[in-house]
Amino acid sequence: MTELKNELIRHSAADLAAKLASREVTAVEVTQAHLDRIADVDGQVNAFLHVNSEEALAVAAEVDAARAAGGSAAEELHALAGVPIAVKDLIVTIGQPTTAGSKILEGWHSPYDATVVKKLRAAKMPILGKTNLDEFAMGSSTEHSAYGPTRNPWDLDRIPGGSGGGSAAAVAAFEAPLALGTDTGGSIRQPGAVTGTVGVKPTYGAVSRYGAIAMASSLDQIGPVSRTVLDSALLQEVIGGHDPFDSTSLTDPFNDLVAAARVGNVAGMKIGIVKELHGEGYQAGVENRFNESLQLLKDAGAEIVEVSCPNLKYALGAYYLIMPSEVSSNLAKFDGVRFGMRVLPKDGPMTIERVMGATRAAGFGDEVKRRIILGTYALSAGYYDAYYGSAQKVRTLIQRDFDAAFAKADVLISPTAPTTAFKLGEKLDDPLAMYLNDVATIPANLAGIPGLSLPGGLADEDGLPVGIQLLAPARQDARLYRVGAVLESILEEKWGGPILAQAPDLKTAVLGAVSTTAGGSN
C-alpha cells in the first residue's frame, strides 16, 4: 500500500484523472495518499497553514459513490473530479480559516466561498487545505508569513519563492498535484521557477478575483500551479470564465486551453526574445538554460526574433508606486472594528482611532507596514501626480511596448527569475534586493497580459531549478499553453523525464534535517 501511495502522489493531475475515470484507483485512495504525504513531510516544508482532511475525504467519497453508481451520476462528473487541490490562503473558503498569512486575520472564517472555490467544489475536487504565503501576498520568498517561512523542497535551507511559495512547494513536494495561487507581480510564476513547477498568470480578468483578498486590485490575478503545462490548462478551464461578481471579469470563454496544450508543434510560430529581460544581472546558469530553450524551440521549427520593450527599465519603479498605493487603500478595511483581531490601547482614552492604531500596529508585519507607508505617501496631496500619476503613465508606455512586440512575435520568452532560489534570510533585510527577484515577471501584471513559467532545467552552479517565462497578448492564453507544452516535452526528452524526478528525496532530506536538529540540541 505504501508503494501505491508513493506512486499515486507522483502522477500528474491528467494521469490521475484518467486512472480515476477508469476506476483503476479511487478518489479516496488518491486523496488519502496526498494527506499522508502532507503528514510525512510538511512539518519541515511548512507549505500548509491548514489541512482539511475530513472535508477532502468526504468529497472524494462522493466522487467514488457517483462512479460506482454509473449512469448519469458518473457521466456528469467533471474530468478532474476526485483530483485533490490546495488553495492559497489568500482565497476565502467556507469551513476553513483564511489568514492571508497575517496575524490580523488569525482564526478568521469567511462566510462565503471565492468564485474559484465554488468552481472547484462544483467539479468535486477535494480541497486538501490552505497554503502558506507572504503576509497579504507581499513578498518574494514566503519569509514574510506570520506563521513561519515555507522551505524549498529542493533544498530546505532555501526559499520557495513568493508570495505563493506554499502552493509551489506543496506541488513540488508531491503534497498536492494542483494548487491555486495569486499573481500580482510574479507570485505564481517566480515560485514556479525556483521550485521546478509550472505557474500561470492568466490574462487579467480571465479568472474571477471575487473572494481573493485584494492586495493591488488592478494587478491581482488568480491562476494555476501544477507540475505540467497540460495540468495548468485543465485547471484554468475549471476556474476561468465570466463572473458577474467581479467587475473586471472578461466574457471570453477561454475554453481552448487544453486543446492548445495538446497541439504538439510550434512550427511557423514567431517567438520573441525580450532584449531587456535577460543578460546583465542574470545568473550565468539561468542564462545558459534560457539559451538552450531558445535553441530547442528553433530546432522544433519556431522562428526566433529579438524584440525590444525599452520602457521595461521603468517597470519595477512604476510597480512599486502603483502596487503600494492600491495596498494602502485595500488594507484600510483591516481596522479591528468589524472582523479580524482587535487590540485595545494599554492606556489613555478608548477611541476608535486608537483601537485601530493599536490593532494595525500589532496585526501587520514589517513588510505590510512598509508598503502601506509607501502607498499612503504616493497618494498624498501634493505628491499624487508626481508619483502615482507618473507611474500610471509609465504603465501605459509598457503596454504600448508589448503591443509593438506582439506585432513582431506570437509569444515572448525570457527567464522567469534572474537567479535560482537563494538561502533563507539572505535578502530578508534588503527590500530592494528582494524586489529585484520579480524584475522579469512584474511587466506582465502592469500590462494585463498572460504569463507562464515552466521548468527550464537546472543551473550549472548549484543544481537548482531555472524557470522559463512565456508571455502572450491579452486573451491569447492558448498560445502560452501551446508553446509551453512543446518546450516542456522537448526539455523532458533532453533530461530523460520531468525535472522534479531529479529533486532530492524529500523524506531523506527531512529525516536529515530532523537528525541535525536533534544532534544540535545535545
UniProtKB/Swiss-Prot annotation:
The active site is at K88 (charge relay system), S163 (charge relay system), S187 (acyl-ester intermediate). Allows the formation of correctly charged Gln-tRNA(Gln) through the transamidation of misacylated Glu-tRNA(Gln) in organisms which lack glutaminyl-tRNA synthetase. The reaction takes place in the presence of glutamine and ATP through an activated gamma-phospho-Glu-tRNA(Gln). Heterotrimer of A, B and C subunits. PANTHER family: GLUTAMYL-TRNA(GLN) AMIDOTRANSFERASE SUBUNIT A (PTHR11895:SF151), TRANSAMIDASE (PTHR11895). It comes from the Bacteria. GO terms for cellular component: glutamyl-tRNA(Gln) amidotransferase complex. Pfam families: Amidase. Its EC number is 6.3.5.7. Keywords: ATP-binding, Ligase, Nucleotide-binding, Protein biosynthesis. Belongs to the amidase family. GatA subfamily. It catalyses: L-glutamyl-tRNA(Gln) + L-glutamine + ATP + H2O = L-glutaminyl-tRNA(Gln) + L-glutamate + ADP + phosphate + H(+). This is Glutamyl-tRNA(Gln) amidotransferase subunit A. Coiled coil: none annotated. GO terms for biological process: translation. It comes from Paenarthrobacter aurescens (strain TC1). InterPro entries: Amidase (IPR000120), Amidase_CS (IPR020556), Amidase_dom (IPR023631), AS_sf (IPR036928), GatA (IPR004412). GO terms for molecular function: ATP binding; glutaminyl-tRNA synthase (glutamine-hydrolyzing) activity.
